[in-house]
UniProtKB/Swiss-Prot annotation:
Residues 28-310 form the ABC transmembrane type-1 domain. This is ATP-dependent lipid A-core flippase. Belongs to the ABC transporter superfamily. Lipid exporter (TC 3.A.1.106) family. It comes from the Bacteria. It is a multi-pass membrane protein. It is an enzyme of class 7 (translocase). The gene is msbA. Its main location: membrane. It is found in: Cell inner membrane. The lineage of its organism: Bacteria, Pseudomonadati, Pseudomonadota, Gammaproteobacteria, Vibrionales.
């Protein structure tokens, strides 16, 4: 799946507007406050005309006495409107960013496993953090400048044309050139912003890789390797940032230079007698000040172009992400609790991008309440079969049935509630042990149920020694627990779920011999009246299985009970001899 980012700015903004309009009341208040702010600035400039023509030009005028009150009132209004607009827009943009992040997060949870196989986790995190934050630039800072500076420009232009349309006509000649310059730098900003997003994802991935593998880095002395790698990607980010800053720095003087030409022309025209005769000192000062006043909003609009384009580029990437097809869930069949009979019928499967199949024409049955074990060397396809049971992937051909119904016909969430999985790669959440055992169960289980599951998994042996017991927070991915302890918590989670089909994917591989023996007795109890698929490396754990399948190169090469396979003296017997040091 590739993300199509060829989407117009206008279309992207229209999609972003669906989030912004949810908070249109706050937006409306902010826009009104921004307009008031801009009008107060324009009115301040307009006071120069009566100040010069009446205040200093007429001894009878009382304008100078009222001017301090006017200025104070305008500054007060300007301050209040500035606070209101900033607060309201921050509230709007904060909510929009929150909604966008939730949208991306929720879509991640709907994506198929194959998507995460191809994407770097650092890039995925960057979309939730960096890209989502950039959207704020388009919904707050950019909007502030567009409304306030846009209103200022309109107000100053009206003021100029009202006082001297002849001098103001010069701007009509300059405006197209300014518009072209802003359009040109907008395209440049857009391109650089896209590159910055990509580079930020690479930076995040590089840092995450080091943090997750820091023990390997330290053990193998890889500090210099990681330092060099991060130096390269961080320098790439710096280069992209400098390109953006260079474009911004060049855009401002170019536009100011164009505007200064207009000012030069105005100064020249003001010296022409036919125009000069119509000007008063106040009129000329207002027009000239308004033209100078246009510099600031024009500069701000040029700067906001980069902010707006960064926000649009980020929004475009995020919308392209949520446009990706989620995990297929076309099934409608649902059952409260399956009986647990599993039939695997001539299935074949190839991972996306792989040249050869991971599984080829595999068939076997697991009767209700029986145990089937899969053994074989690493990479032979054992875990792939388990992933197909729960539809983390879909078969290319053949079918897997649960109680005689194709698993693709089940409603996906309902299907997965029929399975409990304990794998060799245990993932625990940064939460209490109790909440990890009862993960996603809500109030379905009582405290006693959780304790009983922990007892059966022999987890209470170490939990009871902890100060907070089941309320102990385990840290990120169970960092405060040993490998064996994490495995016992995972087994307790599966025990509590009490699903009709149990998948044990190297479930005891992280345990020492004593712990394995203790937990194996709990697993034996758990497997009663359940359909069990066991993927094992230690053959001692599956000798009691009703049927053992030897998987090699994606195909079943042997099947039978432990004693039958030993007697056959084939691949299984050879594995057995290697593990137990026989002959």
């Amino acid at each position: 799946m590739s993300i199509n980012t060829d989407e117009s700015t206008w279309r992207t903004f229209k999609r972003l507007w669906t989030f912004i309009r949810l908070y249109k009341s706050g937006l409306a208040v902010a826009v009104v406050a921004l307009i008031i702010n801009a009008v107060s600035d324009t009115y301040m400039v307009s006071l120069l005309k009566p100040l010069l023509d009446e205040g200093f030009g007429s001894a009878e005028s009382d304008f100078l006495r009222t001017l301090p009150l006017l200025v104070f009132g305008l500054m007060f209004i300007r301050g209040i409107s500035s606070f209101v607009s900033t607060y309201c827009l921050s509230w709007v943009s904060g909510n929009v960013v929150m909604q966008v992040r939730r949208m991306v997060f929720n879509h991640y949870m709907q994506m198929p496993v194959s998507y995460f196989d191809k994407e770097k986790s650092g890039s995925l995190l960057s979309r939730i953090t960096y890209d989502s934050e950039q959207v704020s630039a388009a919904t707050s800072q950019a909007l502030v400048s567009i409304v306030r500076e846009g209103t200022s420009i309109i107000g100053l232009l009206v003021l100029m044309f009202y006082n001297s349309w002849q001098l103001s006509l010069v701007l009509i000649l300059v405006a197209p050139v300014v518009a072209w310059a802003i359009g040109f730098v907008s395209k440049r900003f857009r391109k650089i912003s896209k590159n910055m997003q990509t580079t930020m994802g690479i930076v995040t991935s590089s840092a995450e890789q080091m943090l997750k593998g820091h023990k390997v880095v330290l053990s193998y002395g890889g500090q210099e390797v990681e330092k060099s790698r991060f130096d390269v990607v961080s320098n790439q980010m710096r280069q992209q940032s400098m390109k953006l800053i260079t474009a911004q720095a060049a855009a401002n003087p170019i536009i100011q230079m164009i505007a200064s030409i207009a000012i030069v022309v105005v100064l020249y025209l003001a010296s022409v007698d036919t125009i000069k005769d119509q000007l008063t000192p106040g009129t000329f000062t207002v027009v000239f000040s308004a033209m100078f006043g246009l510099m600031r909003p024009l500069k701000a609009l040029t700067n906001v172009t980069s902010q707006f384009q960064r926000g649009m580029a980020a929004a475009q990437t995020l919308f392209a992400l949520v446009d990706l097809e989620p995990e297929k869930n076309t099934g409608t069949y649902s059952v409260e609790r399956a009986k647990g009979e599993v039939n695997v019928k001539d299935i074949s499967f190839t991972y996306e991008g792989a040249e050869k199949p991971a599984l080829s024409h595999v068939s076997f049955d697991i009767p209700r309440g029986k145990t089937v074990a899969l053994v074989g060397r690493s990479g032979s396809g054992k875990s792939t079969i388990a992933n197909l049971f729960t539809r983390f992937y879909d078969v290319d051909s053949g079918e897997i049935q649960l109680d005689g119904v194709d698993v693709r016909d089940y409603e996906l969430k309902n299907l997965r509630t029929q399975f409990a999985l304990v794998s060799q790669n245990v993932h625990l959440f940064n939460d209490t042990i109790a909440n990890n055992i009862a993960y996603a169960a809500g109030d379905k289980y009582s405290r006693e149920d959780i304790e009983r599951a922990a007892e059966l998994a022999h987890a209470m042996e170490f939990i009871s020694k902890m100060e907070n017991g089941l309320d102990t927070v385990v840290g990120e991915n169970g960092a405060s627990l040993s490998g064996g302890q994490r495995q016992r918590v995972a087994i307790a989670r599966a025990l509590l779920r009490d699903a009709p089909v149990l998948i044990l994917d190297e479930a005891t591989s992280a345990l020492d011999t004593e712990s394995e023996r203790a937990i194996q007795s709990a697993l034996d109890e758990l497997q009663k009246n359940k359909t069990v698929l066991v993927i094992a490396h230690r053959l001692s754990t599956i000798e009691k299985a009703d049927q053992i399948l030897v998987i090699d190169d994606g195909a079943v090469v042997e099947r039978g009970s432990h004693s039958e396979l030993i007697e056959k003296d084939g691949a299984y017997a050879q594995l057995h001899r290697i593990q137990f040091g026989e002959g």
